[in-house]
Amino acid sequence: MVRQHSQARFLTVAEVADLLRVSNMTVYRLIKAGELPAARIGKSFRVREDDIDAYLEERFTQAG
């Protein structure tokens, strides 16, 4: 099944930080390092909710 762009949920850096229980700066570092994909819209970043899920899944796999 192909997911349409209109269904994707995008979060701000602050929302991602709150979800991951880290600082905004940590989220910016993850984006800059290429560990967390993000789209730049104007001067701010947006992160797809699916990309956060994939990031967490990868981290749990590495830890286990």
Regions found by a protein language model. Give the residues of each.
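Polyanion-binding surface elements
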Residues: 2-29, 58
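Major-groove DNA-recognition helix of helix-turn-helix-type DNA-binding domains
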Residues: 20-44
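A short macromolecule-binding patch
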Residues: 47
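A short, Lys/Arg-enriched interface patch at domain edges and termini
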Residues: 50-64
